[in-house]
């Protein structure tokens, strides 16, 4: 088969005697890779940095952002990143086959190098830098999981809680002004950055300077 014939077959091309998968990229440049025939789905209004890795059964919803070196690996269970959520540098989302999926709700901030494995994070939550949330855990809305905290498998964190430590424990309830300052402000700032980057990308595609 010639190289030209390969390109005509659904975008596939031969490499070293085998057929390579067509290349798909998310807004922002992240390479999307299929797993067992399932491709990631990224909303056109989301932004995913070109160094992020997004594999398999992954959904990234409108306005969400995925930052440098993030890994979203949907090979063992499905992953969903909710609308206007940010997955920050070096974070990893994964699951356990036959046991769990990972769901991140809307307007969630997942800090640098955090790990979410087979858990559910409800809307309007802040996951601190380096925090870990394990299989079957549920973090209800308006929670802050402190930097480096570990939420154990199967644990449920009540709405409006501050969690700290290893193992993670609820240390107190959050005040309304803390929810506004830590959770809402973080969401708004990363949404602003996402829209800025999407605007720059659109301008570059048209040959225009960014904002």
Language-model segments: which ranges?
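N-terminal segments that cap or nucleate solenoid repeat domains
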Residues: 22, 26-66
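Glycine-rich hexapeptide-repeat left-handed beta-helix
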Residues: 2-41, 75, 81-84, 89-96, ...
């Amino acid at each position: 088969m010639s190289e030209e014939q390969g390109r005509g077959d659904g975008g596939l091309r031969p490499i070293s005697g085998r057929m390579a998968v067509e290349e798909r990229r998310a807004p922002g440049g992240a390479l999307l890779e299929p797993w067992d025939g399932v491709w990631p789905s990224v909303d056109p209004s989301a932004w995913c940095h070109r160094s992020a890795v997004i594999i398999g059964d992954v959904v990234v919803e409108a306005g969400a952002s995925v930052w440098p070196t993030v890994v979203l690996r949907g090979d063992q269970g499905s992953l969903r990143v909710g609308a206007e959520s940010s997955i920050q540098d070096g974070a990893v989302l994964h699951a356990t086959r036959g046991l769990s999926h990972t769901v991140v709700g809307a307007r969630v901030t997942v800090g640098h190098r955090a790990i979410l494995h087979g858990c559910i994070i409800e809307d309007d939550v802040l996951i601190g830098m380096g925090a870990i949330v394990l299989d079957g855990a549920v973090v209800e809305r308006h929670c802050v999981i402190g930097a480096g905290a570990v939420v154990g498998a199967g644990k449920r964190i009540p709405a409006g809680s501050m969690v700290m430590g290893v193992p993670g424990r609820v240390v107190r309830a959050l005040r309304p002004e803390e929810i506004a300052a830590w959770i809402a402000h973080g969401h708004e700032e990363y949404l602003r950055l996402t829209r800025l980057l999407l605007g720059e990308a659109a301008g570059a595609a048209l040959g225009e300077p960014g904002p």
